[in-house]
Structure formats: structure tokens, C-alpha cells
Regions:
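Bacterial Sec-dependent N-terminal signal peptides
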Residues: 1-24
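Structured catalytic-domain cores with a bias toward divalent-metal coordination
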Residues: 19-389
């Protein structure tokens, strides 16, 4: 593999030296070679000097990122030295329920699946959360806990909500318009802080891994507004150096019709030159860190302003977006689903679909490429063209 990497690097130097863009690509590759390490090791390296690590999740629907997240949790160091993981997904008042699910033993796999689905039907303030990676994550975490003497505790940070207490569309509107929802980043930060303060220290330290979507993870404030993102709140609460924010590789998600590659594809091209070997690295004072951040809503920021590090795990053209949880809408649950659908859709001023249309929205398993609306092949070719043009 080292010979192939050296070959690609020579190609860059020899064939692209005349182009301004090639110099930038060479800088990115050199930076990765000099500063990076394996993603799991990178996360634990951050924990050596910081108590809280935030992973900025890419598209909520992507399943490949949870392969990495479960690898981190599966590492013996996590249960022994960290012990606590928090997620954006999941209403805070369901935290005790999810830990009962994850820390007890079930006689059969089917018994766990039944308990998991029963829990999932009440975890979120949407009629149902349809992202399959939630099943993937909770199954994986249950398996880790089942085989470990040291158990991992999961904290849920989203708004307090119970479908049992919502009877009308107006009641749902009142919830949706509440300050807790309007300022979700503040709400999730507060919920984390309350649970974090109650953690049992391990080796004299409280440590935690937080998984939240990329926009929430930002160390940023909306330009001209007094509205911090979750990452910004956490750094203010616990200290700039005590909280480390790491972004998973993704696209410039704000342009959803095109989903352009970051830095015109140079980051992905550098990853390609490294034969897509996963890596994590700090980005301060690197070409990655000096790259302007693509979302102008936060002002004139660079990547090193909004995050401490990046992880490249899977090339963009291998990401898989999956929705639908087969079997989540059982016959016994159909009536309750339609009750929620009527309330939710009326509250959102949308036409209420019949059961035959509503049910597949949540339990029909559907996967498509993470490059959507572009094809994986076209994105891969675009990236490789940057190396060989």
C-alpha cells in the first residue's frame, strides 16, 4: 500500500506541478501524511487531554458513519475510561428507558428486537423516527454492553416530549413553537450539562462522547444573532481546550440540489490519493483548517474556527442513506400511528395521508447513495479527475 501511495504522490508532483490547484492538493496530501492517524486512535488521543469530544455527524440517514461510531464504542478503552455517550436523537425524558433497554439481558434476539421496537415508537417527537441507523446504533450498543463487564450509558439530549400527552394539533404546535424547540442547540446543551454533572467519574474524571449533526456541532454563532450552536455552547461551558469538535467528512450540505464537495473536491482528492484509508487529524494551522467554511450564515469563518479536527471515513461515493424500519408499524400500532399522523400533519398544515400511504413512510426499507442527487460514479470520477487531469 505504501508503494501505491508513493506512486500517487509522485504523479501529483510530476504531472500537476504547473497548476495552482495541484500545489494545494499536494499540501493537503502532505498534511494528512504528516499529522493523521487511524480514526479510533485519534478520538482516544483527544480524550487524553480533553474531557468532552463532539463528533459532527453527516447526513442523519447515513449508515456508514455508525460503523465507525460503533468501532469507537467497541474499543475496550471506551467502556473502561469514558463510559458515556450522548446523542442528539432521542427525547431527554426517554433516557432511563433506553438504558433499561441497553443494559438488561434478553433471552433471545427476538425478545430484544421486540423491546427495541417498543422503545423506538416513543423515542422521538416526530410520528416516528425513520432513520435506520438508529436501529443499527442501538443494536450495536446493546451488543457491546452485553459482552462487557463495564457498561456504556447513553444520554438523550433532545427536547422533552411524550406522545401520550399530545391530543390535538394545537398542542403539537405549542410544543413546536416553544423556546425549547426554537433554541434546540441551547436545549440540548442544557440537557447534556445536567446529565454530565451526574456522571460517575472514571479514574477521577468525567468524560463523554457526544454525537450530534454537523450544524449543531459547530463552534459558531449565527451572524448577527445571539444564537449559539451546540458546539459553541459546550466550549463556553467547559472550556475551549476541554471540548474538542471533530467533523466527519461530508459535502457542502447547504446546497442540497448539488451537494458540492468541500474545497472544490480537494479534500476528497487527498483522501483518494491516500487510497481512502480512514484517518483523523487536528486541522489548526493546516491547509484544511485555513479553508474558508462554506456556510456564510456564520460569518467569515475558516474550518479551524468551527472545528478542531476532521475524520475521513469512507469516500463520499460509498456513503449509504437508509430510511425505513421494517416492522416498526405493527398491526397493533397502526391506530396510534394514524393518531400521530393526523395531529402532526394538521399542525404542519399538510394534507393527512391515509394509512396505506403513511405506513410505508416509516417501515419501508429504502437505501440510496449518499451522493444523491448525483450518481456515485460521477462523483468518484470528478474526484479522480482532480488527480489526473
Amino acid at each position: 500500500m505504501k508503494k501505491r501511495i508513493a506512486f500517487w504522490f509522485c504523479v501529483l508532483c510530476a504531472t500537476l506541478s504547473g497548476y495552482a490547484q495541484s500545489s494545494s492538493l499536494q499540501d493537503y496530501v502532505a498534511s494528512v501524511r504528516a499529522k493523521s492517524c487511524a480514526p479510533v486512535d485519534y478520538i482516544f488521543k483527544l480524550f487524553e487531554h480533553s474531557d468532552i469530544v463532539v463528533i459532527g455527524e453527516r447526513d442523519h440517514r447515513d449508515t456508514t458513519q455508525y460503523e465507525l461510531i460503533l468501532d469507537i464504542l467497541r474499543d475496550a478503552r471506551f467502556a473502561e475510561e469514558i463510559g458515556y455517550v450522548y446523542t442528539e436523537v432521542g427525547c431527554v425524558n426517554r433516557t432511563k428507558d433506553v438504558n433499561r433497554l441497553l443494559q438488561r439481558k434478553y433471552k433471545t434476539a427476538q425478545a430484544f428486537s421486540d423491546a427495541l421496537y417498543s422503545y423506538l415508537r416513543n423515542e422521538d417527537f416526530n410520528p416516528l423516527w425513520d432513520k435506520y441507523n438508529r436501529v443499527q446504533f442501538l443494536r450495536g450498543l446493546y451488543g457491546i454492553n452485553r459482552s462487557n463487564r463495564h457498561k456504556i450509558t447513553l444520554g438523550l439530549t433532545d427536547c422533552n416530549f411524550s406522545w401520550d400527552k399530545i391530543k390535538t394539533a394545537q398542542e403539537y404546535r405549542d410544543f413546536d413553537d416553544s423556546p425549547a424547540c426554537a433554541y434546540r442547540d441551547s436545549t440540548m446543551s442544557l440537557h447534556f450539562a445536567e446529565m454530565y454533572a451526574k456522571q460517575k467519574p472514571k479514574n477521577g474524571k468525567r468524560k463523554a462522547l457526544i454525537i450530534t449533526n454537523h450544524p449543531h456541532a459547530l463552534n459558531a454563532t449565527f451572524a448577527g444573532k445571539d444564537y449559539h450552536r451546540q458546539g459553541k455552547w459546550l466550549k463556553e461551558l467547559y472550556g475551549e481546550d476541554n471540548v474538542k469538535i471533530v467533523m466527519l467528512n461530508w459535502t457542502e450540505y447547504t446546497q442540497k440540489e448539488q451537494m458540492p464537495l468541500v474545497a472544490s473536491g480537494l479534500w476528497d482528492a487527498a483522501f483518494e490519493v491516500m487510497e481512502c484509508q480512514p484517518f483523523g487529524m487536528d486541522i489548526k494551522e493546516t491547509p484544511f483548517g485555513r479553508e474558508p467554511y462554506f456556510n456564510a450564515r456564520y460569518g467569515d469563518l475558516k474550518w479551524e474556527d468551527i472545528a478542531d479536527g476532521i475524520i475521513y471515513y469512507k469516500p463520499i461515493y460509498e456513503l449509504v442513506l437508509t430510511i425505513g424500519i421494517p416492522g416498526i408499524v405493527s398491526i397493533d400500532f397502526e391506530e396510534e400511528l394514524m393518531r400521530r399522523i393526523r395531529i402532526y400533519f394538521e399542525a404542519m398544515d399538510r394534507p393527512v395521508p391515509p394509512l396505506e400511504e403513511a405506513k410505508p413512510m416509516y417501515d419501508r426499507f429504502l437505501s440510496f447513495p449518499g451522493t444523491y442527487p448525483q450518481s456515485p460514479h460521477s462523483v468518484r470520477d470528478t474526484i479522480r479527475h482532480l488527480i489526473t487531469e
